[in-house]
Protein backbone atom coordinates (compact mmCIF):
# COMPACT_ATOMS: atom_id res chain seq x y z
CA UNK A 1 0.00 0.00 0.00
CA UNK A 2 1.44 3.38 -0.86
CA UNK A 3 1.70 6.33 1.52
CA UNK A 4 -1.01 8.36 -0.27
CA UNK A 5 -3.59 5.60 0.12
CA UNK A 6 -2.71 5.11 3.79
CA UNK A 7 -3.04 8.87 4.40
CA UNK A 8 -6.44 8.96 2.67
CA UNK A 9 -7.68 6.03 4.74
CA UNK A 10 -6.54 7.68 7.98
CA UNK A 11 -8.20 10.99 7.07
CA UNK A 12 -11.43 9.23 6.06
CA UNK A 13 -11.43 7.27 9.32
CA UNK A 14 -10.97 10.41 11.41
CA UNK A 15 -13.80 12.18 9.56
CA UNK A 16 -16.17 9.27 10.15
CA UNK A 17 -15.23 9.23 13.85
CA UNK A 18 -15.79 12.99 14.14
CA UNK A 19 -19.38 12.65 12.97
CA UNK A 20 -20.30 9.36 14.64
CA UNK A 21 -23.32 9.11 16.93
CA UNK A 22 -22.20 9.11 20.58
CA UNK A 23 -24.35 7.56 23.31
CA UNK A 24 -24.39 9.99 26.22
CA UNK A 25 -26.49 7.51 28.22
CA UNK A 26 -25.17 3.94 28.34
CA UNK A 27 -28.43 2.40 29.62
CA UNK A 28 -26.77 1.19 32.85
CA UNK A 29 -25.64 4.10 35.01
CA UNK A 30 -24.89 7.83 35.03
CA UNK A 31 -21.32 7.54 33.74
CA UNK A 32 -20.37 10.72 31.86
CA UNK A 33 -22.82 12.89 33.82
CA UNK A 34 -22.74 14.97 36.99
CA UNK A 35 -25.78 15.55 39.22
CA UNK A 36 -26.41 19.16 40.27
CA UNK A 37 -28.88 19.67 43.10
CA UNK A 38 -30.72 17.36 45.48
CA UNK A 39 -33.40 16.02 43.13
CA UNK A 40 -33.35 12.32 42.21
CA UNK A 41 -31.55 10.96 39.11
CA UNK A 42 -31.27 7.20 38.75
CA UNK A 43 -31.30 4.36 36.23
CA UNK A 44 -33.98 1.67 36.24
CA UNK A 45 -34.58 -1.02 33.58
CA UNK A 46 -32.42 0.77 31.02
CA UNK A 47 -34.13 4.12 31.57
CA UNK A 48 -32.71 7.26 33.13
CA UNK A 49 -35.25 8.81 35.50
CA UNK A 50 -35.49 12.25 37.03
CA UNK A 51 -37.88 12.66 39.93
CA UNK A 52 -38.63 15.42 42.41
CA UNK A 53 -36.93 15.00 45.77
CA UNK A 54 -37.88 16.34 49.21
CA UNK A 55 -36.51 19.82 48.43
CA UNK A 56 -38.80 20.18 45.36
CA UNK A 57 -36.08 22.32 43.80
CA UNK A 58 -34.47 22.63 40.38
CA UNK A 59 -32.07 19.84 39.53
CA UNK A 60 -29.84 19.01 36.58
CA UNK A 61 -27.93 16.13 35.09
CA UNK A 62 -24.96 17.72 33.31
CA UNK A 63 -22.71 16.15 30.69
CA UNK A 64 -18.99 16.05 31.43
CA UNK A 65 -18.22 16.98 27.80
CA UNK A 66 -18.88 20.22 25.96
CA UNK A 67 -20.38 20.49 22.48
CA UNK A 68 -20.56 23.33 19.93
CA UNK A 69 -22.28 22.17 16.71
CA UNK A 70 -24.33 19.01 17.11
CA UNK A 71 -27.50 17.04 16.60
CA UNK A 72 -28.86 15.68 19.88
CA UNK A 73 -31.57 13.02 19.96
CA UNK A 74 -33.46 12.20 23.16
CA UNK A 75 -36.42 9.96 23.89
CA UNK A 76 -38.54 10.91 26.88
CA UNK A 77 -41.79 9.96 28.58
CA UNK A 78 -43.47 12.28 31.03
CA UNK A 79 -45.21 10.98 34.13
CA UNK A 80 -47.16 13.13 36.53
CA UNK A 81 -46.02 16.73 35.97
CA UNK A 82 -43.45 16.27 33.21
CA UNK A 83 -41.89 19.73 33.35
CA UNK A 84 -38.29 19.30 32.25
CA UNK A 85 -35.93 20.44 29.53
CA UNK A 86 -32.80 19.82 27.50
CA UNK A 87 -30.14 22.50 28.00
CA UNK A 88 -27.38 23.12 25.47
CA UNK A 89 -24.29 25.37 25.44
CA UNK A 90 -24.75 25.56 29.19
CA UNK A 91 -22.57 26.22 32.20
CA UNK A 92 -23.57 25.56 35.80
CA UNK A 93 -22.61 26.84 39.24
CA UNK A 94 -24.37 24.89 41.99
CA UNK A 95 -27.91 24.74 40.61
CA UNK A 96 -27.72 28.04 38.74
CA UNK A 97 -27.55 27.20 35.06
CA UNK A 98 -26.76 29.48 32.14
CA UNK A 99 -27.46 28.66 28.53
CA UNK A 100 -30.44 27.67 26.43
CA UNK A 101 -33.19 25.15 27.00
CA UNK A 102 -35.22 23.17 24.51
CA UNK A 103 -38.41 22.92 26.55
CA UNK A 104 -39.91 19.58 27.62
CA UNK A 105 -43.22 20.35 29.30
CA UNK A 106 -46.84 19.21 29.64
CA UNK A 107 -49.21 19.63 26.69
CA UNK A 108 -49.65 23.25 25.50
CA UNK A 109 -46.62 24.47 27.48
CA UNK A 110 -44.24 24.94 24.53
CA UNK A 111 -42.30 21.67 24.24
CA UNK A 112 -39.66 22.27 21.57
CA UNK A 113 -39.49 26.01 22.22
CA UNK A 114 -36.20 27.66 23.22
CA UNK A 115 -35.76 29.51 26.51
CA UNK A 116 -32.64 31.40 27.63
CA UNK A 117 -31.96 30.74 31.31
CA UNK A 118 -31.14 33.80 33.43
CA UNK A 119 -31.19 35.93 30.30
CA UNK A 120 -33.80 36.95 27.76
CA UNK A 121 -36.36 34.29 28.66
CA UNK A 122 -38.42 32.81 25.82
CA UNK A 123 -36.70 33.31 22.46
CA UNK A 124 -39.25 31.30 20.47
CA UNK A 125 -42.25 29.05 21.12
CA UNK A 126 -43.93 26.57 18.79
CA UNK A 127 -47.12 27.69 17.06
CA UNK A 128 -50.38 26.54 18.67
CA UNK A 129 -51.01 23.82 16.05
CA UNK A 130 -47.65 22.21 16.83
CA UNK A 131 -48.35 21.98 20.57
CA UNK A 132 -50.49 18.90 19.84
CA UNK A 133 -47.48 16.91 18.54
CA UNK A 134 -46.53 15.96 22.12
CA UNK A 135 -47.79 12.50 23.13
CA UNK A 136 -48.62 12.73 26.82
CA UNK A 137 -47.79 9.62 28.82
CA UNK A 138 -46.06 8.04 25.81
CA UNK A 139 -42.53 7.99 24.45
CA UNK A 140 -41.58 11.08 22.44
CA UNK A 141 -38.48 11.72 20.33
CA UNK A 142 -36.92 15.17 20.36
CA UNK A 143 -34.06 16.27 18.13
CA UNK A 144 -32.14 19.47 18.88
CA UNK A 145 -29.85 20.60 16.06
CA UNK A 146 -27.41 23.46 16.68
CA UNK A 147 -25.10 24.69 13.91
CA UNK A 148 -23.47 28.08 14.34
CA UNK A 149 -26.19 30.57 15.24
CA UNK A 150 -29.08 28.38 14.05
CA UNK A 151 -31.18 26.11 16.26
CA UNK A 152 -33.84 23.71 15.01
CA UNK A 153 -35.95 21.45 17.20
CA UNK A 154 -38.06 18.51 16.09
CA UNK A 155 -40.63 16.56 18.09
CA UNK A 156 -41.80 13.18 16.81
CA UNK A 157 -40.58 14.09 13.32
CA UNK A 158 -42.28 17.52 13.23
CA UNK A 159 -40.14 20.65 13.09
CA UNK A 160 -41.16 22.74 16.10
CA UNK A 161 -39.00 25.86 15.69
CA UNK A 162 -36.17 27.46 13.74
CA UNK A 163 -34.16 30.16 15.47
CA UNK A 164 -31.14 32.24 14.50
CA UNK A 165 -29.33 33.89 17.40
CA UNK A 166 -25.84 35.43 17.43
CA UNK A 167 -25.40 34.83 21.16
CA UNK A 168 -25.97 31.09 20.70
CA UNK A 169 -23.59 31.08 17.72
CA UNK A 170 -20.83 32.63 19.84
CA UNK A 171 -21.19 30.12 22.68
CA UNK A 172 -20.34 26.53 23.52
CA UNK A 173 -20.97 24.37 26.57
CA UNK A 174 -22.39 21.25 28.10
CA UNK A 175 -25.65 19.37 27.65
CA UNK A 176 -27.95 19.16 30.69
CA UNK A 177 -31.29 17.57 31.46
CA UNK A 178 -33.51 19.50 33.86
CA UNK A 179 -36.03 18.66 36.53
CA UNK A 180 -38.26 21.67 37.25
CA UNK A 181 -38.91 22.93 40.75
CA UNK A 182 -42.26 22.69 42.53
CA UNK A 183 -42.36 18.94 43.19
CA UNK A 184 -44.38 16.17 41.59
CA UNK A 185 -42.13 15.93 38.51
CA UNK A 186 -41.11 12.61 36.96
CA UNK A 187 -39.64 12.12 33.48
CA UNK A 188 -38.10 9.01 31.94
CA UNK A 189 -35.31 9.15 29.34
CA UNK A 190 -34.16 6.10 27.39
CA UNK A 191 -32.07 7.46 24.53
CA UNK A 192 -29.64 10.36 24.74
CA UNK A 193 -27.35 10.43 21.71
CA UNK A 194 -25.35 13.20 20.07
CA UNK A 195 -23.57 13.64 16.78
CA UNK A 196 -20.98 16.39 16.34
CA UNK A 197 -21.54 18.44 13.18
Tell what function each PLM region has.
Residues 19-197:
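Carbohydrate-interacting regions of secretory-pathway proteins
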Residues 9-18:
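Hydrophobic h-region of N-terminal signal peptides that target proteins for export
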